[in-house]
């Protein structure tokens, strides 16, 4: 079968789905980010030549492709991310906050034959906030290959966070907590891996703590160098539909410290430390507890990802869902 996989940008988890689908089908790709006439035409031609449209994110930018696919009688499978179904006015986040934003998303999901959610938290948000029939929503966790199998790095008491530091993520992604916790824990090293698009000292109103190292963006192929040595991984997000970087860190035996928010507790389960509330004291206490845990906790975190969120599990289930949708 010919499958068109459409997305705004090609992230690592989208690349994994491309690899899975290409193992059994002919896969072509299209970025729907640009709505320029030439790009729209390329998208329409790609839809015309495919048998099924597999869409990552129910974005308004993808609506023309979905409408055209359904006009041609071709099935659509949509994977919903975090933003589309979120309704979080307290952090000014989510497509479901306003009816003007909800309508295009609901059109896309209404035209889709199958909707995939990457966590139970996401599934519940899709059903509740976007009024989607539960029978259309299928839970399919992200799947991770064991790329840390041969890692023998020696852990050091470093606290790591990975992600882009920008104005939209300062509160939502818990970047603020990373920098403020570092101020309260001067005896420990904090490492931030990812692009920095904001003036952090200006936001803080003071210089950055000297125990913080900003690495900058690194290729996915080398990020394991940082996961491998850090004992603790901090994800203080207020909203995550899953939290792929947390799972990747857990594969490298990092002990996860996460906020009790949306899908994060679902990912870490009973491993690591989960904190509640907005106080920096709670973050510091959670980090202190994690740093005192022995290496066995990191191994438990790794095994959780391998057992619950394996690449082979996602591959098997996704290919079966594709076949079921094709037959229907």
Please tell me what each predicted stretch does.
Residues 255-258:
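Short hydrophobic beta-strand element within catalytic cores of glycosyltransferases
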Residues 151-185, 191:
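Conserved donor-binding/catalytic core segment of Leloir-type glycosyltransferases
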Residues 238:
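Aromatic "clamp/platform" in nucleotide-sugar-dependent glycosyltransferases that forms part
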Residues 110-149, 158-164:
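Donor nucleotide-sugar binding/catalytic pocket of nucleotide-sugar-dependent glycosyltransferases
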Residues 295-308, 317:
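A short, well-ordered alpha-helix in the C-terminal region of glycosyltransferases
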Residues 201-224:
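Nucleotide-activated donor-binding/catalytic signature segment of Leloir-type glycosyltransferases, i.e.
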Residues 272-280, 288-294:
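Conserved acidic donor-binding segment of nucleotide-sugar-dependent glycosyltransferases
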Residues 96-115:
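Membrane-proximal helix-turn-helix segments that form the acceptor-binding/catalytic region
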